[in-house]
Amino acid sequence: MGGIPFRSTGCNTCRRRKVKCDEAKPECNRCIKNGHVCTGYERKRVFIHKSSEVIDDGELKLARRPKSTSGKIPDRQLTRVEPGLPRLNINAEVRSQLLASFVGGFLPSSRHLQDGKESNILKTLPELCGNSPLLDRALLSLSSAFLAKQHKDDRLLGYSTKLYNNSMEIMHGKIKSGRGLGQDVLYTTVIFQLYELIHSSPPGFMAWIAHVQGSNAIINQCSVRKKETIAEKLFHRQLKFVTLCDAVGRRKAATLYEVLTTQQRLSQGSTELEPIDELTDLLAECSALIEHVDIFIEQLPACPNGDKNDGEKLLGSCLSLEGRLHQTCLRMQEKLGTPSTGLHDVPLREDMRAHLATSLFPDPFQFASLACAESHLIYWATLIILYPLVDELLDVLGYCRNDVTPSQSCATHPPTGEQRSLDLDVTTDFTALAEHYADEICRSVMYCTQSDMNTLGAQHLLAPLSQSAQFFQVHEVAQKYRWCQGVFVLLDSLGLGIAPLLKDMVWPQYRSARLRRSLSSTGKVS
């Protein structure tokens, strides 16, 4: 009888070269001596799931047929039973490997992280496994959906969809039970939001919105600890941001966001926040100003001689927010750095490179880290939303263009000879300034979509680029709008199935506000 087959324990390079390895770690001496790259001892893991195309004798089962009236056909015979979905081993080890493959394929390489490390919601997922059957199912559906899309595996995608629907049923049962909900339920709603970004369900964009609003509906039912864990902090940050996206789209104040911000500060025992948190807090203030300005403008036709003081206060609030945005950006740049224009030989896919190369915008930006890029994108997106409000208030209050000037913005890149000063017309026209910052977001696309950025960089682009595209569309900047549409189509190949649905997405409230402004000259206050 033969013994156990020999299995080499050497490094991957020596195994491939079929030579004896001295097994020194982390790199073997033989590879170093002979000038080879030692690829280490970690074996490549391959996940194999059975499909209906490969059925062995073990899947032949007895199936009882209805009794025949003639009695000639036996009522019991072997029947081939086709599995409707792949059978995937979901034991703890395989589940953790599947999740690790998803996280590794979604997050960027360490060179794009601040100081080689950054807190991210996905990094906390492995530690959450095994504590909640609901959350485990949601995480497995998310991981398998991403990997299925990456490898074009329809069977695995079908498995993911079934698991997703099963998780939804479990969650709805927990909510309807009337009992207190744990943090795992809140986390699951956020996981579902990520799932919709990767593999959008038939309702499309509105399925993502439904999960955002579902999170908002249950947050007060979920138990809150006195001191947040890192995972709780990152999940709450994600929930705050998507709540803001929904609120800005509906042109309503993000009321829940204020509760979350207060909870976070109380749990930290400090009012000091990270730069991205400060900027999203200011975006929340902007969402409230949108609603207040809309109400003020809409009341003008019924009351042409409306209270000018209310309009003046709103204008003052907008300009105050603008100044605080610039100051926050300056503090952020002290910590994270400023953009530069030295982006050369960026590793991009050819179809991506062909579309992004354009003369519509100045040179593309380079950032010190993805956190630096994300913070600037939120800063610019907030200004795109804010400046049209200022222009509209100036119109209805009867101000001339030069009566109010914007405050000094922070530099987009270090003050060198390359620094471009804005044209005089732009610095005295708030809507033109908004277009300038929409351009800045477009200049960031190449950095966020380079090959080793994986999917996270593209995810950070979704909301800001959507604001730019909406601005270009309603202000009829056709070429720039078509360029943004092309980017959204390409983002699908980076793992964001929702992106193509955003290429034609203009919130109805945003379009009606633009139409209202074109008619606002008839409703000036005196």
Identify what each model region corresponds to.
Residues 26, 35-37, 448, 492-496:
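Intrinsically disordered, low-complexity transactivation/modulatory regions
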